[in-house]
Amino acid sequence: MAKGEGHILAQNKKARHDYHIVETVEAGIVLTGTEIKSVRAARIQLKDGFAQIKNGEAWLVNVHIAPFEQGNIWNADPERTRKLLLKKREITHLENELKGSGMTLVPLKVYLKDGFAKVLIGLAKGKHEYDKRETIKRRDQERDIKKQMKHYNAR
């Protein structure tokens, strides 16, 4: 667990497969009371989510937080756009990186830190299909080498 992060509630494994992660930034999320209860129960899905910057503010889009079971009328829309809490300097830095560079912001993981929900946002560049195949091939080769070393050392 890097950067002093707490209990990991959700991870976006697909993001590391589909993108080259250039840089990561930790951000807070503005949630309602029933949403934080669902997040603490790990009922959050980051798979199709992304972040965008509008009017000098960062927003988390397409992240699904399941409705809290006992929340009835207080539950918010599960797919609503949520504000990210970042410093102005971080927002301008990310905005400059995103301009005309083919980069995007993807949520990598959600975790609790000192009782607050935090999201790790990655500044990412899309991978081509051959990059994905190369990554899978390299991972398989490393796995085979470890297996052979384990077998060799067991003698």
Swiss-Prot record:
Keyword Hydrolase carried by entry: no
Subcellular location(s) of the protein: Cytoplasm
Any one annotated GO CC term: cytosol
UniProt superkingdom: Bacteria
Keyword RNA-binding: yes
Database matches in InterPro entries: SmpB (IPR023620), SsrA-bd_prot (IPR000037), SsrA-bd_prot_CS (IPR020081)
Gene3D superfamilies: 2.40.280.10
Swiss-Prot/TrEMBL GO biological process terms: trans-translation
Keywords: Cytoplasm, RNA-binding
Bias (Basic and acidic residues): 135-147
Family, as annotated: Belongs to the SmpB family.
Function: Required for rescue of stalled ribosomes mediated by trans-translation. Binds to transfer-messenger RNA (tmRNA), required for stable association of tmRNA with ribosomes. tmRNA and SmpB together mimic tRNA shape, replacing the anticodon stem-loop with SmpB. tmRNA is encoded by the ssrA gene; the 2 termini fold to resemble tRNA(Ala) and it encodes a 'tag peptide', a short internal open reading frame. During trans-translation Ala-aminoacylated tmRNA acts like a tRNA, entering the A-site of stalled ribosomes, displacing the stalled mRNA.
Protein name: SsrA-binding protein
Native organism: Streptococcus pyogenes serotype M3 (strain ATCC BAA-595 / MGAS315)
Lineage: Bacteria, Bacillati, Bacillota, Bacilli, Lactobacillales
Name of encoding gene: smpB
